Amino acid sequence: MSSPAATATAAAAEGGRPGRVRARQRLIEACVSALHLYGPSRTTVSRVVSIAGLSPGIVRFYFNSKAALLVAALGFLADEFEERVLKPVAALKHSPVAALGLLVELYLDPEIASPRKVSVWYSFWGEASSRQEYLDICGQKDEDFARLVHELTETLIEQTGARHLDADGVALGLIGVLEVLWQGIAFQSEASLNRRALVARALAYLRSVFPGQFPGPAAPRRRTR
């Protein structure tokens, strides 16, 4: 009698392109989970297939090595970030207030910024100095994000006439705020996170730089004697 893992392997191998795509994605998702639990150096093929519920033999259909599987997992995260964050925000670039508000929401969304995925991003960054593939993918993601944030802040400065502001400094400040919030997410569980509070903290920075441009709690009224 075949095991469930062996049955899944056979189905993936014989199920045509849709089945192969699903099995490959299943391995990548399992690899992300393994990286979250064990880090790159302790993630093994056996741990990945165990999480995926597949047999070890299936890996050779899609990846010629553990290294190739890890690069595919990082590439998946980078593609997801581009599709779910960069592209929707860039589509609103002529409305920088709406675009920056959406950027904050999406950057801190649990689909992108789950403790699992954020911790994996940091794991890869930790290994990037010794792995050119990791450095290339992580670096490109950060460059694209920084370029978009700078473009949006520059446009907003022009539209509001706040020419005393420096676009580089404002963009760097927002990126820094979001980075600090991601660092906090990496070391917490989803149940302990207050997503609304995280978004509010990032928007508070934008309100402090561009008063009246971003919705938020009204300023407390000054008490009169």
Where are these regions (language model features)?
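Solvent-exposed, amphipathic alpha-helical segments
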Residues: 26, 30-37, 84-88, 120, ...
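Amphipathic alpha-helical segments used for helix-helix packing
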Residues: 98-99, 113-136
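N-terminal intrinsically disordered/low-complexity leader segments
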Residues: 1-22, 214-225
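Short, basic, alpha-helical segments at the C-terminal edge of helix-turn-helix-like DNA-binding modules
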Residues: 75-81
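Helix-turn-helix
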Residues: 26, 30-68, 72
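Secondary-structure edge/capping motif, primarily at the C-terminal ends of alpha-helices
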Residues: 92, 125-129, 185-189
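Hydrophobic/aromatic-rich alpha-helical bundle segments in the mid-to-C-terminal region
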Residues: 133-139, 143, 156-225
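Hydrophobic alpha-helical connector segments
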Residues: 72, 86-117, 164-174, 218-225
